[in-house]
C-alpha cells in the first residue's frame, strides 16, 4: 500500500475512526445448496436488502437449467440467462426475496429443484468492488453512464433487458473491443458498444446492443484493485483483479495477483472458446493437472452442469497454468480473467473456525457450522488405526500423520458442503474428525512446489507470524517437519510422525527444513524444497480468545494452563519436547473431564488410551493434573511441553 494511503488511514484511526475495511465475506459469496422443490432461504452473510447486489445461480448436476441472474435494481421477479440473448422474463418462483444476510428461493426447478445441486455467486454493491446500473438508451454516440465504483472498472457486462440481444463484455485488458458472454467468440474489435470507462462513468457508442434509443439495459460493473483496495481488517487489501495473460504451452504462465483467489473467470480473447467459472467451493484445486479432470468448471455461455477440467493451479499469490489447453493456455493467445480473493475476515469466535464431530448419517459425513478447509480423521478411536489428514486445496488426496508415506486418494474426501465435509461412509460414533476453517491470524494452508533453492520464500496468508508450522512432502516419501515457537526468537524443530524430542537450538532440522518466519512468508530449504516435489504446509497462530500456541514446564503438581479463553479448551494438542514423547490429542467430544480423558496419538496407530486422568476442564484453558499413576503423560516433573489449544 502506498505510504500516503497508510498515513491517511493512520490519521483517521488516531482521530477516532477506523482503518478497517469491508471483508471479502461481506461482499462476495460462493454458496452451494441442494434444492427442495419448495421454499428455501440461503444465508450467506451478504446484505442484499440494505446494500444491493447481484445473485447468479446455476444448477450443477444437469444441463437443463441455465445460468440465471437476479439483481436488486431490476427486482426479484426478473430473470436473465447468460447462455441466451433473450430478454428478461418475469417469474415469482425463483428468487423471491433479497435479505440482509442472503436471499430466498421459490420452488422453480431452475433454482431449487429436488434433489438437484446448485451453485450461487453473490456480488454485493460496494465501492471498488461491484456496482449495478440500469439505464435507458438514447442512441447517441459517446453517451456516458454513471457508476459508483469510485475507481476505474476492470470489467463491465451490459445486457438489453426488454428485447433479445447479446450480452456485451468490456474488459480493461482489451479495451478497444468487446466480447459476448452468451457465445464463444473471441474479441470483436469495434468500439461502438462500450468505448471506455473511468472512475465515475463508462462511455457507450451507438450500437443497439448497448444504446438503442428507448431500450432498457442493466450493467454489472466490476472493479480492478491495483494497490488501491480498501478491504480487510486493515482497510488496505485488494480483493478483485481483472487482468490478462499470454498463453505459453512450454513455459507456463504464473499470474501474481498479490492474493490467493477463491473465484476465477477466464476467457480467451483471441479465439472461440468457452467462458470458464471455477471456485474453491466446487473443487478448484492447487494441482489440477490431470487431463481426466481434477476440478469442476461451469461455462456461462452454455447450460451444461459441472464439467471436469484441469490445468489451472491455485497458489498463495494467484494462479498458474500447468498444461496446454486451448481454453486456458494456447500459445500466443490472450486470455482475460477476473479473480476474487479468498476470505479476509478475522474470526470473532472459535465456533466460526473449528469443530469436532463423529461420523453421522446423511451428508456431509462430518457436520460443522462452516465450510471446512482442513480435516483430521481418525477412523476408529477404539481400535488401532491411522489418522488421516486432508484439505480443500488438494481435494480427495490425503496423508497419514504417523508415516512418511506419499499422499493417496479417498474419493469420499470431498469439500463441496457449506456445513462440514466428506462423503465417507455410514454413521459411526468411533470415527471422528477435527475440522478447521482458514482465517487470518488463526490458521492457513499453503500448497507449493519445490525448486531446490536454499532459504526459499513461500508466501502465506496468515497475516501474522506463525507459531506452529507443520509441512509434509506430498508426492513421495518425506517426514512431517514441525517448527513450534517457544519464545519470540526461538522455535523448536522436530517431526510430527515421530515421538522424538524437538530440537530447541536451531530450526535446521532434517536438512535445513525451515530458516525464517514472518507475517507473510516462511523460508524453507533442504527436505522441504526438493525440485519438482509438492508440499503442503499448515500454519497456526494464537488469536485472543480463540486459539493458543504455548509451552509449559511440568513440575508434577496440578497446573492451570491459561490460554485466555472463557469457556475452556475444546481441542488440545500436546508434545513433550526435551525428550521422547507422543503427539497427544484431547477434545471435548471424546472427553476433557474431571476423570479419565481419552488420548489419541497423531504419530502412531495406537487405539485411544482412556485409562488415565491427564487433563481437567478449566475455563481459561485447561488443567494438567498432578503426575501419578492416574496421570503419567503430560506432567512429568522437569519436562518441557508445547501445546496448541482451541477454545
Regions found by a protein language model. Name each.
Residues 2-647:
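Surface-exposed molecular-recognition determinants
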Amino acid at each position: 500500500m502506498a505510504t500516503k494511503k497508510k498515513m491517511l488511514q493512520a490519521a483517521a484511526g488516531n482521530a477516532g475512526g477506523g482503518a478497517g475495511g469491508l471483508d471479502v465475506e461481506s461482499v462476495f459469496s460462493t454458496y452451494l445448496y441442494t434444492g427442495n422443490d419448495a421454499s428455501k432461504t440461503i444465508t450467506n452473510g451478504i446484505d442484499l436488502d440494505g446494500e444491493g447486489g447481484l445473485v447468479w445461480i446455476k444448477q450443477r448436476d444437469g444441463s437443463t437449467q441455465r445460468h440465471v441472474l437476479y439483481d436488486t435494481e431490476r427486482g426479484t421477479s426478473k430473470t436473465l440467462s447468460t447462455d441466451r440473448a433473450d430478454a428478461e422474463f418475469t417469474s415469482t418462483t425463483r428468487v423471491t426475496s433479497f435479505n440482509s444476510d442472503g436471499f430466498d428461493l421459490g420452488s422453480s426447478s431452475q433454482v431449487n429443484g429436488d434433489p438437484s445441486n446448485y451453485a450461487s455467486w453473490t456480488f454485493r454493491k460496494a465501492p471498488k468492488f461491484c456496482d449495478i446500473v440500469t439505464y435507458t438508451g438514447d442512441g447517441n454516440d459517446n453517451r456516458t453512464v454513471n457508476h459508483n465504483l469510485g475507481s476505474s472498472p476492470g470489467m463491465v457486462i451490459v445486457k438489453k433487458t426488454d428485447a433479445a440481444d447479446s450480452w456485451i463484455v468490456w474488459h480493461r485488458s482489451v479495451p478497444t473491443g468487446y466480447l459476448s458472454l452468451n457465445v464463444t467468440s473471441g474479441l470483436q474489435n469495434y468500439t461502438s458498444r462500450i468505448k471506455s470507462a473511468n472512475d465515475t462513468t463508462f462511455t457507450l457508442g451507438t450500437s443497439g446492443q448497448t444504446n438503442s434509443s428507448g431500450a432498457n439495459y442493466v450493467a454489472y460493473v466490476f472493479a480492478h484493485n491495483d494497490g488501491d483496495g480498501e478491504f480487510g481488517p486493515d482497510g488496505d487489501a485488494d480483493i478483485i483483479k481483472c487482468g490478462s495473460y499470454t498463453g505459453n504451452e512450454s513455459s507456463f504462465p504464473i499470474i501474481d495477483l498479490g492474493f490467493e483467489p477463491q473465484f476465477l473467470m477466464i476467457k480467451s480473447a483471441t479465439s472461440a472458446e468457452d467462458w470458464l467459472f471455477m471456485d474453491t467451493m466446487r473443487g478448484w484445486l492447487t494441482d489440477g493437472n490431470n487431463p481426466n479432470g481434477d476440478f469442476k468448471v461451469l461455462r456461462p455461455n452454455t447450460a451444461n452442469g459441472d464439467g471436469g477440467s484441469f490445468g489451472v493451479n491455485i497458489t498463495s499469490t494467484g494462479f498458474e497454468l500447468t498444461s496446454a489447453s486451448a481454453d486456458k493456455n494456447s500459445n500466443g493467445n490472450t486470455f482475460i480473467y477476473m479473480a476474487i480473493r479468498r476470505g479476509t475476515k478475522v474470526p470473532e469466535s472459535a465456533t466460526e473456525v473449528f469443530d469436532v464431530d463423529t461420523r453421522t448419517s446423511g451428508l456431509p459425513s462430518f457436520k460443522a457450522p462452516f465450510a471446512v478447509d482442513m480435516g483430521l480423521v481418525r477412523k476408529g478411536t477404539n481400535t488401532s488405526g491411522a489418522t488421516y489428514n486432508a484439505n480443500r486445496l488438494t481435494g480427495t488426496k490425503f496423508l497419514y500423520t504417523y508415516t512418511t508415506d506419499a499422499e493417496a486418494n479417498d474419493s469420499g474426501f470431498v469439500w463441496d458442503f457449506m456445513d462440514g465435509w466428506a462423503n465417507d461412509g455410514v454413521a459411526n460414533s468411533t470415527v471422528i474428525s477435527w475440522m478447521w476453517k482458514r482465517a487470518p491470524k488463526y490458521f492457513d494452508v499453503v500448497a507449493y512446489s519445490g525448486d531446490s533453492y536454499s532459504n526459499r520464500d513461500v508466501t502465506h496468508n496468515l497475516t501474522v507470524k506463525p507459531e506452529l508450522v507443520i509441512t509434509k512432502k506430498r508426492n513421495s516419501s518425506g517426514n512431517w517437519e514441525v517448527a513450534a515457537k517457544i519464545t519470540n526468537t526461538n522455535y523448536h524443530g522436530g517431526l510430527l510422525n515421530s515421538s522424538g524430542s524437538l530440537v530447541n537450538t536451531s530450526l535446521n532440522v532434517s536438512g535445513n527444513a525451515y530458516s525464517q518466519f514472518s507475517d507473510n512468508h516462511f523460508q524453507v530449504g533442504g527436505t522441504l524444497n526438493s525440485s519438482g516435489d509438492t508440499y503442503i504446509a499448515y500454519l497456526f497462530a494464537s488469536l485472543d480468545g480463540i486459539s493458543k500456541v504455548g509451552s509449559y514446564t511440568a513440575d508434577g503438581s496440578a497446573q492451570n494452563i491459561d490460554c485466555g479463553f472463557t469457556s475452556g479448551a475444546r481441542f488440545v494438542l500436546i508434545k513433550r519436547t526435551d525428550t521422547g514423547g507422543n503427539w497427544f490429542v484431547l477434545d471435548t467430544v471424546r472427553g476433557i473431564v474431571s476423570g479419565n480423558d481419552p488420548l489419541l496419538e497423531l504419530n502412531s496407530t495406537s487405539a485411544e488410551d482412556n485409562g488415565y486422568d491427564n487433563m481437567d476442564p478449566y475455563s481459561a484453558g485447561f488443567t494438567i493434573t498432578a503426575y501419578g499413576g492416574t496421570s503419567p503423560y503430560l506432567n512429568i516433573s522437569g519436562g518441557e511441553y508445547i501445546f496448541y489449544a482451541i477454545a
